[in-house]
């Protein structure tokens, strides 16, 4: 039974390749002029992921902070952004923000790309913050107490004890 299952899996992976080659040769590939959107999409995703990670970590730290103003502001931002659909944020970046921001001469298309980068970054940061907050809560309180007993300060405890363990715990959630 397992041998047949393995053969079916191998066949399922190998049979689409000749079919794909036939389709590409018979009907032609994608016109290179249509690849511009793909590159822009990859650029937007990379910028959003890289820029949202530090912002998300700061928001998660703010949400778990003992300072009420910081905690409330972080919580309000995260809940507001997570409660609004991404398409709404993108439409606001496209249609509403130009009315409030000064226009730079001749950079309208690039301005739109920058606005979308910021919108994706702010949206992704809220979700990263929630994942990191879960990781921060997963670190046992005894770790912090042990670090305090050793005389470490708050920044050292966060940087050397809490954040490495929290980020290690949330890698699957961030990647998936």
Question: What residues fall within each predicted segment?
Answer:
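Transmembrane alpha-helices and adjacent helix-loop boundaries
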Residues: 1-176
């Amino acid at each position: 039974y397992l041998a047949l299952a393995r053969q079916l899996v191998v066949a399922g992976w190998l049979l689409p390749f000749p079919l794909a080659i036939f389709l590409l040769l018979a009907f032609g590939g994608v016109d290179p002029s249509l690849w511009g959107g793909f590159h822009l999409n990859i650029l937007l995703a990379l910028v959003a992921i890289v820029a949202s990670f530090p912002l998300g970590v700061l928001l998660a730290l703010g949400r778990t902070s003992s300072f009420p103003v910081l905690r409330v502001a972080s919580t309000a931002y995260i809940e507001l952004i997570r409660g609004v659909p991404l398409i709404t944020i993108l439409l606001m970046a496209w249609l509403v923000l130009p009315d409030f921001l000064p226009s730079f001469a001749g950079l309208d298309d690039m301005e739109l790309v920058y606005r979308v980068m910021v919108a994706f970054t702010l949206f992704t940061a809220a979700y990263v913050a929630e994942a990191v907050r879960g990781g921060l809560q997963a670190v046992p309180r005894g770790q912090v107490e042990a670090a305090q007993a050793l005389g470490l300060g708050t920044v050292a405890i966060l940087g050397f004890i809490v954040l490495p363990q929290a980020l290690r715990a949330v890698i699957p959630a961030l990647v998936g």
